[in-house]
Amino acid sequence: MPSQPENCLFCRLVADGDHVHAADGFVAIRDINPIAETHLLVLPTRHVDTFRDVDAFSDEEAGRMLRFVAETAQAAGLDDYKVLVNVGEGGGQTVFHLHWHVLGGRFDRGKLSHALALETA
């Protein structure tokens, strides 16, 4: 269910969270329920509900977002990693503020399997 910026947990974390990396309209924070040794979330500083709304970004902003995801992994010391985006409730999205999961190191296989499962009707 889409959220409003005034009720959005990630909007609050953008404003007041413990950022591990920040630049050019994006921040990275640690996930509070990590499924890997390194589990970071990359968030745009302005509220966009989901990846479906990627057109809210200009081409230049979208390029900066992708570069920021890569820079976040590099800043965390990751050479090999996964990048995930959950889109919609059926795709596993639980917080409706666009975010990218950057996962590196050892994975908790049980949590990873649960995170990758899609809801089916």
Task: State what each model feature region is.
Residues 1-121:
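HIT superfamily nucleotide-processing domains
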